[in-house]
């Protein structure tokens, strides 16, 4: 955060290969679903493929019933939440999935500028990784969480999906 936050134990170098979220890193040993998906594009595409089909290659990992349990809305009044996944649901995630994604599209985004999107209708997987947080802080005194990368077109994740659905 450009040196705006300083206290004992806070990581100050550019973070690679570890969760960026401080709560997850320090309190949860770096493992928690709320902090995003952390890997490379190839491995995230494999995970997305498993979520699309229940398997990868010759291996089956989940039955259709388990897949449905993962991706079904978890509350009647919140069609945009699955189990560990965001759902397009009631068009409340268009800033991530664009305006044309079907309601059963699922995915996960991350604060650092990542998007994994799975559209079962189009048999489509999107893995989009940016480094918007690895940019200077715009104004350390005003807001140490406002990075220059937030203003880049690439950090507006929904535009990727929007472009894919254009005819």
Residue positions per predicted region:
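Residue-level detector of beta-strand structural context in well-folded domains
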Residues: 83, 114-116
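Short, well-ordered beta-strand elements
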Residues: 116-117, 123-131, 136
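Short, gly/Ser/Thr-rich active-site loops of penicillin-recognizing serine hydrolases
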Residues: 53-56, 65-66, 71-79, 90-93, ...
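Short, surface-exposed loop or secondary-structure junction motifs
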Residues: 1-103
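Short, small/polar residue-rich loop motifs at catalytic or cofactor-binding pockets
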Residues: 110-112
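Short conserved micro-motifs at the rims of enzyme active sites and ligand-binding pockets
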Residues: 97-98, 129-130, 138-141
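A structural signal for well-ordered alpha-helical segments within the folded catalytic domains
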Residues: 41-45, 120-121, 154-158, 162
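Short, structured beta-strand/loop micro-motifs enriched in basic residues and often containing a Trp
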Residues: 107
